[in-house]
Every structure is written in structure tokens, then in C-alpha cells.
Swiss-Prot record:
Cellular component per GO, a single term: extracellular region
Entry keyword annotation includes Disulfide bond: yes
Species, as recorded: Conus bandanus
Protein name (database record): Conotoxin Bn5a
Tissue specificity remark: Expressed by the venom duct.
Coiled coil: none
Cysteines engaged in disulfide bonds, as pairs: C3-C10, C4-C9
Keyword Disulfide bond: yes
Keywords: Disulfide bond, Secreted
Lineage of the species this protein comes from: Eukaryota, Metazoa, Spiralia, Lophotrochozoa, Mollusca
Record family assignment: Belongs to the conotoxin T superfamily.
Secretion signal span: none
Amino acid sequence: NGCCIVRECC
């Protein structure tokens, strides 16, 4: 994993 729903990575 890396990125959330849209285009911002957590």
C-alpha cells in the first residue's frame, strides 16, 4: 500500500 482513495499518499 501507499496511497489513499484519491491521490494523496498517507
